[in-house]
Amino acid sequence: MRKSFTFLATALLAGLMFNTSAQAAKTYQVGTDAAYAPFESQNEKKEIVGFDIEVLKAIAAKGGFQVKFINTPWEGIFASLNNGDRDIVISAVTITPERKQTMDFSEPYFEAKQLIAVNNSSKINKLADLKGKKIGVQTGTTGDEAAQKLLGKTSPNIKRFESTPLAIQELQSGGVDAVIADNGVVVNFIANNGKGKLRTIDDASFAKEYYGIAVKKGNKALLEQINKGLAAIKADGTYDKIYKQYFGK
Protein backbone atom coordinates (compact mmCIF):
# COMPACT_ATOMS: atom_id res chain seq x y z
CA MET A 1 0.00 0.00 0.00
CA ARG A 2 2.81 2.38 0.91
CA LYS A 3 4.63 1.62 -2.34
CA SER A 4 1.49 2.34 -4.35
CA PHE A 5 0.93 5.60 -2.51
CA THR A 6 4.54 6.61 -3.03
CA PHE A 7 4.33 5.80 -6.73
CA LEU A 8 1.08 7.75 -7.06
CA ALA A 9 2.50 10.75 -5.24
CA THR A 10 5.62 10.69 -7.39
CA ALA A 11 3.54 10.50 -10.55
CA LEU A 12 1.33 13.37 -9.44
CA LEU A 13 4.37 15.48 -8.56
CA ALA A 14 6.00 14.72 -11.90
CA GLY A 15 2.79 15.68 -13.69
CA LEU A 16 2.55 18.90 -11.74
CA MET A 17 6.14 19.76 -12.58
CA PHE A 18 5.53 18.98 -16.25
CA ASN A 19 2.44 21.20 -16.34
CA THR A 20 4.30 24.02 -14.63
CA SER A 21 7.16 23.67 -17.09
CA ALA A 22 4.75 23.65 -20.02
CA GLN A 23 3.06 26.79 -18.79
CA ALA A 24 6.41 28.51 -18.28
CA ALA A 25 7.44 27.61 -21.82
CA LYS A 26 4.31 28.93 -23.55
CA THR A 27 4.97 30.07 -27.11
CA TYR A 28 3.74 33.52 -28.11
CA GLN A 29 3.08 34.65 -31.69
CA VAL A 30 5.18 37.72 -32.48
CA GLY A 31 4.39 40.17 -35.26
CA THR A 32 7.30 42.01 -36.89
CA ASP A 33 7.63 43.84 -40.20
CA ALA A 34 10.85 42.29 -41.51
CA ALA A 35 11.80 45.17 -43.79
CA TYR A 36 13.73 47.48 -41.47
CA ALA A 37 17.34 46.41 -41.04
CA PRO A 38 19.10 46.20 -38.69
CA PHE A 39 16.07 45.85 -36.42
CA GLU A 40 14.23 43.20 -38.42
CA SER A 41 14.81 41.80 -41.90
CA GLN A 42 15.01 38.50 -43.75
CA ASN A 43 18.28 36.78 -44.63
CA GLU A 44 18.96 34.74 -47.75
CA LYS A 45 17.22 31.77 -46.13
CA LYS A 46 14.10 33.89 -45.50
CA GLU A 47 14.74 33.71 -41.76
CA ILE A 48 13.73 36.76 -39.75
CA VAL A 49 16.82 38.26 -38.16
CA GLY A 50 17.89 41.50 -36.54
CA PHE A 51 18.41 43.45 -33.35
CA ASP A 52 14.77 43.31 -32.26
CA ILE A 53 14.70 39.57 -32.90
CA GLU A 54 17.77 38.84 -30.78
CA VAL A 55 16.58 41.13 -28.00
CA LEU A 56 13.18 39.44 -27.74
CA LYS A 57 14.72 35.96 -27.88
CA ALA A 58 16.95 36.90 -24.95
CA ILE A 59 14.01 38.42 -23.08
CA ALA A 60 11.98 35.26 -23.63
CA ALA A 61 14.77 33.07 -22.27
CA LYS A 62 14.92 35.14 -19.10
CA GLY A 63 11.16 35.67 -18.85
CA GLY A 64 10.27 31.99 -19.09
CA PHE A 65 8.46 31.84 -22.43
CA GLN A 66 9.11 31.10 -26.10
CA VAL A 67 8.45 33.16 -29.22
CA LYS A 68 7.57 32.51 -32.84
CA PHE A 69 8.24 35.39 -35.23
CA ILE A 70 5.78 36.03 -38.05
CA ASN A 71 6.49 38.54 -40.81
CA THR A 72 3.57 40.96 -40.59
CA PRO A 73 3.08 44.01 -42.85
CA TRP A 74 3.34 47.30 -40.98
CA GLU A 75 -0.07 48.54 -42.11
CA GLY A 76 -1.80 45.64 -40.35
CA ILE A 77 0.57 44.91 -37.52
CA PHE A 78 -1.36 46.64 -34.73
CA ALA A 79 -4.69 45.23 -35.89
CA SER A 80 -3.19 41.74 -35.67
CA LEU A 81 -2.33 42.45 -32.04
CA ASN A 82 -5.74 43.79 -31.14
CA ASN A 83 -7.67 40.96 -32.81
CA GLY A 84 -5.55 38.27 -31.16
CA ASP A 85 -3.67 36.98 -34.22
CA ARG A 86 -0.45 38.15 -32.58
CA ASP A 87 0.42 38.16 -28.89
CA ILE A 88 3.40 40.50 -29.16
CA VAL A 89 4.59 43.13 -31.62
CA ILE A 90 8.23 44.12 -31.84
CA SER A 91 9.11 46.16 -34.90
CA ALA A 92 11.02 49.31 -33.93
CA VAL A 93 7.73 50.67 -32.57
CA THR A 94 8.00 54.13 -31.05
CA ILE A 95 6.04 54.52 -27.82
CA THR A 96 3.55 57.37 -28.29
CA PRO A 97 0.60 58.64 -26.23
CA GLU A 98 -1.74 57.74 -29.10
CA ARG A 99 -0.55 54.15 -29.32
CA LYS A 100 -0.68 53.72 -25.56
CA GLN A 101 -4.43 54.26 -25.75
CA THR A 102 -4.93 51.06 -27.75
CA MET A 103 -2.08 48.80 -26.61
CA ASP A 104 0.31 48.35 -23.70
CA PHE A 105 4.07 48.76 -23.96
CA SER A 106 7.03 47.29 -22.17
CA GLU A 107 9.66 49.47 -20.61
CA PRO A 108 11.71 51.11 -23.41
CA TYR A 109 14.38 48.87 -24.91
CA PHE A 110 15.92 51.26 -27.45
CA GLU A 111 16.54 54.99 -27.56
CA ALA A 112 16.26 56.38 -31.06
CA LYS A 113 16.66 59.77 -32.65
CA GLN A 114 17.68 61.24 -35.95
CA LEU A 115 21.31 61.48 -37.01
CA ILE A 116 22.97 63.46 -39.76
CA ALA A 117 25.42 61.49 -41.89
CA VAL A 118 28.09 63.34 -43.87
CA ASN A 119 31.35 62.53 -45.60
CA ASN A 120 34.42 62.81 -43.39
CA SER A 121 35.73 65.77 -45.39
CA SER A 122 32.49 67.75 -45.03
CA LYS A 123 32.49 71.06 -43.16
CA ILE A 124 28.93 70.42 -41.95
CA ASN A 125 28.84 70.13 -38.14
CA LYS A 126 25.24 70.86 -37.15
CA LEU A 127 21.70 70.86 -38.54
CA ALA A 128 21.76 74.59 -39.30
CA ASP A 129 24.72 74.04 -41.62
CA LEU A 130 22.41 72.10 -43.96
CA LYS A 131 20.55 75.24 -45.07
CA GLY A 132 21.02 75.53 -48.82
CA LYS A 133 22.50 72.02 -49.00
CA LYS A 134 21.11 68.89 -50.66
CA ILE A 135 19.68 66.52 -48.05
CA GLY A 136 18.92 62.86 -48.68
CA VAL A 137 16.05 61.26 -46.75
CA GLN A 138 13.85 58.19 -46.83
CA THR A 139 10.37 59.19 -47.99
CA GLY A 140 7.82 59.71 -45.23
CA THR A 141 10.19 59.31 -42.29
CA THR A 142 11.06 61.52 -39.34
CA GLY A 143 14.20 62.46 -41.24
CA ASP A 144 12.02 63.65 -44.11
CA GLU A 145 10.02 65.78 -41.66
CA ALA A 146 13.21 67.27 -40.19
CA ALA A 147 14.46 68.23 -43.63
CA GLN A 148 11.11 69.84 -44.46
CA LYS A 149 11.19 71.91 -41.28
CA LEU A 150 14.64 73.17 -42.16
CA LEU A 151 14.30 73.75 -45.91
CA GLY A 152 10.55 73.89 -46.50
CA LYS A 153 8.13 71.19 -47.64
CA THR A 154 8.57 71.88 -51.34
CA SER A 155 12.32 72.49 -51.34
CA PRO A 156 14.06 71.00 -54.38
CA ASN A 157 17.08 70.35 -52.17
CA ILE A 158 15.29 67.52 -50.37
CA LYS A 159 16.14 64.32 -52.25
CA ARG A 160 13.86 61.43 -51.35
CA PHE A 161 14.69 57.72 -51.58
CA GLU A 162 12.84 54.46 -51.02
CA SER A 163 15.25 53.43 -48.27
CA THR A 164 17.87 54.94 -46.01
CA PRO A 165 20.72 52.82 -47.46
CA LEU A 166 19.95 54.22 -50.93
CA ALA A 167 20.12 57.75 -49.53
CA ILE A 168 23.48 57.06 -47.89
CA GLN A 169 24.83 55.52 -51.09
CA GLU A 170 23.89 58.76 -52.85
CA LEU A 171 25.83 60.64 -50.16
CA GLN A 172 28.87 58.47 -50.82
CA SER A 173 28.67 59.16 -54.55
CA GLY A 174 28.36 62.92 -54.00
CA GLY A 175 24.74 63.33 -55.06
CA VAL A 176 23.71 64.85 -51.72
CA ASP A 177 25.59 66.74 -49.02
CA ALA A 178 24.06 64.92 -46.05
CA VAL A 179 21.49 62.35 -45.00
CA ILE A 180 19.07 62.67 -42.09
CA ALA A 181 17.80 59.31 -40.84
CA ASP A 182 17.16 57.02 -37.88
CA ASN A 183 20.27 56.57 -35.77
CA GLY A 184 20.11 52.78 -35.67
CA VAL A 185 19.95 52.41 -39.44
CA VAL A 186 22.65 55.03 -40.04
CA VAL A 187 25.11 53.60 -37.51
CA ASN A 188 24.59 50.06 -38.79
CA PHE A 189 25.14 51.10 -42.42
CA ILE A 190 28.33 53.01 -41.63
CA ALA A 191 29.70 50.14 -39.56
CA ASN A 192 29.24 47.76 -42.48
CA ASN A 193 29.77 50.01 -45.51
CA GLY A 194 31.24 53.38 -44.63
CA LYS A 195 33.99 53.02 -42.03
CA GLY A 196 36.56 55.76 -42.43
CA LYS A 197 34.48 57.49 -45.09
CA LEU A 198 31.44 58.80 -43.23
CA ARG A 199 30.75 60.40 -39.86
CA THR A 200 27.60 61.25 -37.94
CA ILE A 201 26.33 64.41 -36.28
CA ASP A 202 23.99 64.25 -33.30
CA ASP A 203 22.17 67.59 -33.32
CA ALA A 204 20.59 68.72 -30.05
CA SER A 205 17.40 69.76 -31.85
CA PHE A 206 16.46 66.15 -32.63
CA ALA A 207 14.05 64.78 -30.02
CA LYS A 208 14.59 61.39 -28.44
CA GLU A 209 12.25 58.52 -29.30
CA TYR A 210 11.86 55.26 -27.42
CA TYR A 211 10.97 51.85 -28.82
CA GLY A 212 8.81 49.47 -26.82
CA ILE A 213 7.45 45.94 -27.13
CA ALA A 214 3.68 46.01 -27.57
CA VAL A 215 1.06 43.62 -26.18
CA LYS A 216 -2.72 43.69 -26.28
CA LYS A 217 -4.26 46.28 -23.98
CA GLY A 218 -4.77 44.78 -20.53
CA ASN A 219 -2.45 41.76 -20.90
CA LYS A 220 -0.63 42.52 -17.67
CA ALA A 221 0.69 38.99 -17.14
CA LEU A 222 2.56 38.89 -20.45
CA LEU A 223 3.77 42.45 -20.01
CA GLU A 224 5.20 41.49 -16.63
CA GLN A 225 7.08 38.55 -18.16
CA ILE A 226 8.53 40.78 -20.87
CA ASN A 227 9.61 43.49 -18.45
CA LYS A 228 11.14 40.87 -16.16
CA GLY A 229 13.18 39.47 -19.03
CA LEU A 230 14.18 42.91 -20.28
CA ALA A 231 15.43 43.95 -16.85
CA ALA A 232 17.41 40.72 -16.59
CA ILE A 233 19.22 41.07 -19.93
CA LYS A 234 20.08 44.68 -19.14
CA ALA A 235 21.45 43.68 -15.74
CA ASP A 236 23.62 40.77 -16.90
CA GLY A 237 25.13 42.46 -19.96
CA THR A 238 23.26 40.46 -22.60
CA TYR A 239 21.53 43.54 -23.97
CA ASP A 240 24.82 45.42 -24.32
CA LYS A 241 26.38 42.51 -26.24
CA ILE A 242 23.46 42.42 -28.69
CA TYR A 243 23.56 46.20 -29.08
CA LYS A 244 27.28 46.17 -29.83
CA GLN A 245 26.80 43.39 -32.37
CA TYR A 246 24.40 45.51 -34.40
CA PHE A 247 25.46 49.08 -33.72
CA GLY A 248 29.15 48.78 -32.97
CA LYS A 249 29.33 50.68 -29.68
Where are these regions (language model features)?
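Ligand-binding cleft/hinge of the Venus flytrap
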Residues: Q42, L56-F65, G143-F161, I190-K195, ...
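Sec/Tat signal peptide C-region and signal peptidase I cleavage site
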Residues: F18-A24
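Flexible hinge/capping segments at coil-to-helix
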Residues: V118-I135
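Bacterial N-terminal signal peptides that target proteins for export
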Residues: M1-A9
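Periplasmic-binding protein-like
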Residues: A34, E111-V118, V187, A191-N227, ...
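Extended ligand-binding regions for polar small-molecule ligands
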Residues: I53-K62, A128, K134, T141, ...
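Extracytoplasmic small-molecule ligand-binding "clamshell" domains
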Residues: A25-A92, D236
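A ligand-binding cleft/hinge motif common to bilobed small-molecule-binding domains
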Residues: S91-Q101, A146-K149, Q172, D177-A207
